[in-house]
């Protein structure tokens, strides 16, 4: 489980058995669904950009979604949605204070 002191949670597009998660745009889709959850709440046009609390990225050539802990404080159900998405799809995830530069492309 993710600790309450985590800076960010990186959900990786790799399943527990090492397979690449499909569809290939899963990270963008998840981040798109979460775009409404942002500091200050929903604003006109906010659906046109990702929330700073849930961003798609790539680490070491693996698609990821970075979930910021502020999401948990502001929108606990949205946080649980992301964590349950990872669990339900058996995706690997890890905690880090920032994007691991050693793994970054």
Predicted features along the sequence, with ranges:
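N-terminal, charge-rich interaction modules
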Residues: 1-33
